[in-house]
Amino acid sequence: MIKHFLLTLTFGFFLNSCAKPAEHQKKVSDPLDHKSISKTQNSDKNDQTPNVTIEGDDLIVVYKNKKTVYKNLIVNEMSVSTELIQNSDSDFSLLYDQNASSTKIKEKYDFIYSDTGIFLVDKEIIKFGQDGLMMTRLYLDNFNLLNKTYEELQSLGAELPDHFEQDGSSLSIYDSKNIPFATKNFRYSAEDLFISYPDVKDGDIKISNVESANNQAFNLEKIGANQQSKILLEQIIRQFPERIVAYLNLADVLWKIQDHDQAKIHYAKYLSLMKSQNKNLSKVPQRVYDRIK
């Protein structure tokens, strides 16, 4: 009897001692879980990736932890719809689809993020109807989206001529001064291009005014639209290989986007052309020599 009582007492003590570490383990895990949640929140708070979303009629942009609301830019009515297109971490687009008349219209606005706001890089307009297809791109300089209205966006390029094509499908490209400087031809029928837009493969750009094209590429770089500037400068060099300043401008853009190896090649080409064409070498920027070392 006594032996049985001692055995029971010993077994109960053993169970009690085993339970206490389990209770202690549970109490320790709570602060660890809380710390993990806090770390995740801090990580989100320090996330510098730009973010753009739609809330009702407004465009919400978060850039470097700063939230900006662009009011009433989202229009979804009987005849107009708005689509937000996330292009990359540096840019996005708004596409307005209008079908109120027999001539269907799409307008695409390409924006970039900047420390001083959201800037409109270019506006593309494509129309399709009984007259055929017309398509234009207008570049903008220093067009900050802050306090702009949908009506102001719509009015951009209103003075440009409408050149409809029945058989072809090409894009007329204008600089920020409304000067046409290039065309872009597509291998689509007019109807297929309109239906597929903006998901169309790049066409061939033909530059007709190299001075305006180069100036526009330089202006794109100034507002931080480096990829757009790069594409245009590459076309200039391909079609006008003796255009000296284009090599310098392209090298500067490549340097900005951290492609230093290609930048050095174009700095060297720029310097070589300056020498071979007997240009004034005193006009060569010091950064050219510094960066090709």
Predicted regions and their residues:
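Acidic, small-residue rich beta-repeat scaffolds with periodic aromatic anchors
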Residues: 5, 24, 97-205
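C-terminal motif of bacterial Sec signal peptides marking the signal peptidase cleavage site
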Residues: 16-17
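Acidic/hydrophobic-patterned starts of short beta strands in beta-sheet-rich repeat architectures
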Residues: 35-55, 89-98
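Alpha-helical adaptor scaffolds
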Residues: 180-241, 245
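Canonical tetratricopeptide repeat
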Residues: 215, 249, 283-284, 288-291
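TPR/TPR-like (Sel1-like) alpha-helical repeat modules
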Residues: 255-278
